[in-house]
Curated annotation (Swiss-Prot):
Membrane topology: Multi-pass membrane protein
Protein source organism: Ochotona roylei (Royle's pika)
Family the entry assigns: Belongs to the cytochrome b family.
Top-level taxon in the UniProt lineage: Eukaryota
InterPro entries: Cyt_b/b6_C (IPR005798), Cyt_b/b6_C_sf (IPR036150), Cyt_b/b6_N (IPR005797), Cytb/b6-like_sf (IPR027387), Cytochrome_b (IPR030689), Cytochrome_b_C_euk/bac (IPR048260), Cytochrome_b_N_euk/bac (IPR048259), Di-haem_cyt_TM (IPR016174)
Name this protein carries in UniProt: Cytochrome b
Cofactor note: Binds 2 heme b groups non-covalently.
Gene that encodes it: MT-CYB
Binding-site list for a ubiquinone: 201
Extra remark beyond the main annotation: Heme 1 (or BL or b562) is low-potential and absorbs at about 562 nm, and heme 2 (or BH or b566) is high-potential and absorbs at about 566 nm.
GO molecular function list: metal ion binding; ubiquinol-cytochrome-c reductase activity
Amino acid sequence: MTNIRKTHPLMKIINHSLIDLPAPSNISAWWNFGSLLGLCLGIQIITGLFLAMHYTSDTLTAFSSVTHICRDVNYGWIIRYMHANGASMFFICLFLHVGRGIYYGSYTYSETWNIGILLLFAVMATAFMGYVLPWGQMSFWGATVITNLLSAIPYIGTDLVQWIWGGFSVDKATLTRFFAFHFILPFIITALVMVHLLFLHETGSNNPTGIISDADKIPFHPYYTIKDALGFLLMISLLLTLVLFSPDLLGDPDNYTPANPLNTPPHIKPEWYFLFAYAILRSIPNKLGGVLALVLSIAILAAMPLLHTSKQRSMMFRPISQTLFWILVADLFTLTWIGGQPVEHPFIIIGQLASFLYFFLILVLMPASSLIENKLLKW
């Protein structure tokens, strides 16, 4: 009799995705981040669900409801900090996952890549709205500053901002709708993840060499299930260390002050994972230009398959491209640092140079270096 996992309509899908899936024999730990992102999403949905049971999305009670969760709800403090720091782990895994895709040329699977970009936008939107919910000073002013950027859109800008706010400023209506969107978006993200995997399984995984590996495949289970389990263990250990020893390390002290529309914090800045994009936004003196640069800082990833000029897929055997890739990584660290600094000399000029270098590397230097490497192949 045939095994039920190979015949049952539902089990068959799971079997083809997680058990009998043919996988390349040489994929490294950089391929662990996809499953780690799935784990992060699961942690965020579960902890978020329990937080939503106790949270109230009203300007008068939101801040105290979060305090109540931490003080009075059984294990509320760990649920709250798992959720807050889980977001940081989510973005660490996201950045590493995207970086892996760029380094090893995974973006040539353009459908999978484009769904991935949509996922990145969706996760960023979710994280932004989640940051508004505790209704601290940085929540309120972050929401005010970022939503206000839409007013830069010609003709419809002001109306659009007021429509999103549900009034003439960030207030009760804004908080309520942000809570509603923050609740629904993770489920939309889950659906997009399934589409992402559907497209990935149409082609199969890439591998570090970038060479087609159809001749040498191994079953996903047990080889990669155990490898993923090790990744899970390491990531949960890191997350729990952060939550139990220094839960506020990555947060902003201003968010422990209840929101006050009459008192602006001296430095308005988002969470650390948005600082690179915030630095790019601030580096352009024009409001509309800044907003466009902000969107393009992520949307530029969609141009990656079009800008691939190399005859090789992966950067594994391309030293010039490797050097430029690591310069790009260093540039992103620089932008992250600048995003957290005040707008004054010398940070302004450093931010402008780093922002220029970011786009110049992706649009000009990396495609050009690939062409040079193509020539070097003939030597």
